[in-house]
């Protein structure tokens, strides 16, 4: 069984976005792993494994418009099912 079940990916579109601040917030406030927060001041790509993807979405939506959201159940994928 995986420690963190959901592969959560999305884009944040906004103004004055800071990938370092976003990464720090994730590290301090969310349980998970495989964090990737890359981009520029107007667009950040997020990739994160967590058991609470709704918390990630809520935080990211507070920073700007979120889109291209993908949440995959990696446990199902590991069992040969659609995630």
Where are these regions (language model features)?
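N-terminal loops that bind phosphate or other acidic moieties
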Residues: 1-83
